[in-house]
């Protein structure tokens, strides 16, 4: 009977250890995926910032040209 108890405890212990290792690996994978998502979000944010900055410059230039031509009389 004692032999069966020891065997059962050993099986349960090994099962818990392997389960713990699997959960740890799963957590690490989730952390890596989250970090990749954060990096992609930062890249998208930087791209949008650059695009909006460029669009603002173009709009400013066009507005300046439009307003400049409005103030001058045609000859």
Curated annotation (Swiss-Prot):
Q: Which GO terms of the cellular component aspect does the record hold?
A: extracellular region; membrane; other organism cell membrane
According to its UniProt entry, the function of this protein is described as: Antimicrobial peptide with activity against Gram-positive and Gram-negative bacteria, and fungi. Has hemolytic activity.
What family is it from?
Answer: Belongs to the frog skin active peptide (FSAP) family. Dermaseptin subfamily.
TM stretches of this protein: none
**Disordered, as annotated region:** 25-44
Biological process GO terms, please? defense response to bacterium; defense response to fungus; innate immune response; killing of cells of another organism
Q: Which InterPro entries match?
A: Frog_antimicrobial_propeptide, FSAP
Where in the cell does this protein reside? Secreted; Target cell membrane
Q: Name one Pfam family in it.
A: FSAP_sig_propep
| Lineage: superkingdom | Eukaryota
Q: Which residues form the signal peptide?
A: 1-22
Q: Per UniProt, which keywords does this protein have?
A: Amphibian defense peptide, Antibiotic, Antimicrobial, Cleavage on pair of basic residues, Fungicide, Immunity, Innate immunity, Membrane, Secreted, Signal, Target cell membrane, Target membrane
| Tissue-specific expression | Expressed by the skin glands.
Propeptide position ranges? 23-45
Residue ranges annotated as compositionally biased, kind Acidic residues, are 30-41
Tell me if Transferase is a UniProt keyword of this record.
no
Give the protein's recorded name: Dermaseptin-S11
The organism's lineage? Eukaryota, Metazoa, Chordata, Craniata, Vertebrata
**Source species:** Phyllomedusa sauvagei
């Amino acid at each position: 009977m004692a032999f069966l108890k020891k065997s059962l405890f050993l099986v349960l212990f090994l099962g818990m250890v392997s389960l713990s290792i699997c959960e740890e690996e799963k957590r690490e994978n989730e952390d890596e995926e989250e970090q990749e998502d954060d990096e992609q979000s930062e890249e998208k944010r930087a791209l949008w910032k650059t695009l909006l900055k460029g669009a603002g410059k173009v709009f400013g230039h066009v507005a300046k040209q439009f307003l400049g031509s409005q103030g001058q009389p045609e000859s």
